[in-house]
Amino acid sequence: MKVAVVVALLCFVCYTAAETCSADGDCKNTICDASHDLECHRGQCTCVNHATACSSAADCSGSCTIFGRHGRWHCVDAKCRCFFV
């Protein structure tokens, strides 16, 4: 029974994990809207708004869509980036 729980937990973690990458071209499953660019950032596929700079989390409010699911905007390296939560 414990093995079944562990396997189920591992399947859930793998299912919810973000798409990993080493270059922008590796991001095949991440889809950004027209006003954002797809970018591989620190090994994770993200959507980024290159036109808008940020200095705090308050500058990047609201939700976004990544992998067809809802994510949240975060201010990382002075850019608003969409990350899966």
Curated annotation (Swiss-Prot):
Keyword Signal assigned? yes
Could you tell me where this protein is found in the cell?
Secreted
Q: What's the chief localization of this chain?
A: secreted
Give the transmembrane ranges: none
- GO cellular component: a single term: extracellular region
Signal sequence residues: 1-18
* Alphabetical UniProt keywords: Disulfide bond, Protease inhibitor, Secreted, Serine protease inhibitor, Signal
Q: How does it get modified post-translation? A: Contains 6 disulfide bonds.
UniProt GO molecular function: serine-type endopeptidase inhibitor activity
Q: So which tissues is this one expressed in? A: Detected in hemolymph (at protein level). Within the digestive gland expression is limited to the basophil cells of the digestive diverticula.
Described by its record, this protein's role is as follows:
Slow-binding inhibitor of serine proteases. The inhibitor rapidly binds to the protease forming a weak enzyme-inhibitor complex, and this is followed by a slow isomerization forming a tight-binding enzyme-inhibitor complex. Active against subtilisin A with a dissociation constant of 0.18 nM. Active against perkinsin. Not active against thermolysin, papain or pepsin.
- Protein's recorded name: Serine protease inhibitor Cvsi-2
Per the UniProt record, the source organism is Crassostrea virginica
